[in-house]
Amino acid sequence: MEQIRRYLQLERFQQHDFLYPXFFQEYIYVFAHGRGFSRSIWSENENTGYDNKSSLRVMKRLITRMYQQNNFIILPNDFNKKNPFLAKKKFFYSQIIAEGFAFIVEIPFSLRFISYLEGKKKIVKSQNLRSIHSIFPFLEDNFSHLNFVLDILILHPVHVEILVQILRYWVKDASSLHLLRFFLNKYWNSLITPNKASSSLSKKNKRLFVFLYNSHVGGYESSFVFIRNQSSHLGSTPFGVLLERIYFYGKIERLVNVFVKVKDFRTNLWFVKEPYIHYIRYQRKWILASKGTFLFVKKWKCYLIIFWQWHFSLWFYPRRIYINQLSNHYFEFLGYLSNLRMTPSVVRSQSLENTFIINNAIKKIDNFVPIISMIASLAKAKFCNVFGHPISKPVRADLSDSNIIDQFGCICRKFFHYYSGSSKKKSLYRIKYILRLACARTLARKHKSTVRTFLKRLGSELLEEFLLSEEDVLFLTFPKASSSLQGVYRSRIWYLDIIYINDLVDHKYKL
């Protein structure tokens, strides 16, 4: 870190929040191009091959060409076919600049975070922190008491100026913002909808897109969190003066005194405040869950539409917000389909000569495997067709049979481990059938034989990789220490492998 700070002279630029000179340092693009986008921006790279002096020639020439309209004129659609060399040169320029932008715009955030960590002598422990393994138990404990879910599709920025305005609150350097605005206006269409010539550009600029997207969504969340915490006064306050809280707490105290002092109206403040809302941001969606009534949830939907249109100048379509009742609809989260199921329970009670039969409905969260989207992912990866029929997958000729079987078995084990908390395993068995038969057809294709002949020759060796021990994988067994019965019980667990969670959560897009 000290080496990178010395190369880039960040202390001098940080004093005035001035990042524009960093665009002309060749080391920026060396670090950005060589560090890999999955690593931190402060990862040191010893094999850069440059000395401690910054070179201005390369980037000055490139920046100068960007401002020359003759080199970046609007070209017809068939220009890339007629002049492939100039087209690749143009995308090469934008790729270099995008890598540098992705590196530079993170500097203010990273320096602020590093200075915060250096100032902290002791890490404060918090009891409210939860790992990813507690997400689904949290849903089982809390969502069973909720009624409605707002499924919101996050807005995309309609114009690049919105992204620049959001970054203006963090980056005080006007020159850097002007250069970023120029770059986004010039290459926005090619970056969002790349063609074959620029397909590699969008993959390498993923970090820049993620940073801009999180900055865009963070502007909504910073306002929304405050509104959610102060939601008890939204019912009687006009949206034009929403943040005005004059006499608000005085009115609440007055209501409390009335309810507490009058014996007939003794109650809690809970009846005055509106129901609490659980908030989750997942991929491109917001999930708001509440135990309020349908009128309360509909009021939140109308308010959110007005809030985004007035405070963020964005036209928000009402059809992007879905009001779903948990007992009738599923909501997708972390690769699972969750649903609130009502389980009837009959309790018989006898008091002296009277017998009472009480019918109770117990709410329980059910989590299912999204079999349709999983089959679509398997079909995209050439394991089956769109109807779920297994097909042979082309493999390299140098792979041995054991390696092929191990690859198919590893995919099957990942699915069973990740979806171990599913309420029903029928969908998992169908996935195992598809992978097992696809593996057999792949091996038969390699040996130029039929599946039946190959299975007879191979025997039961092929099935061993797919026959998982459900006692070890799907359940854990714990002794009942507090019970008088010396027995054991089984409970559903959540085996969320953090290493593979991204691949399985995003199975709609990749396998």
Curated annotation (Swiss-Prot):
Disulphides: none
Entry's localization field: Plastid
Keywords for the protein's UniProt record, in alphabetical order: mRNA processing, Plastid, RNA-binding, tRNA processing
Main location: plastid
GO cellular component, one term: chloroplast
InterPro entries, sorted: Domain_X (IPR024937), Maturase_MatK (IPR002866), Maturase_MatK_N (IPR024942)
Gene Ontology molecular function: RNA binding
Lineage top rank: taxon: Eukaryota
GO biological process: one example: mRNA processing
Family to which this protein belongs: Belongs to the intron maturase 2 family. MatK subfamily.
Described function: Usually encoded in the trnK tRNA gene intron. Probably assists in splicing its own and other chloroplast group II introns.
Name of the featured protein: Maturase K
Organism for this UniProt entry: Lathraea clandestina (Purple toothwort)
Gene that encodes it: matK
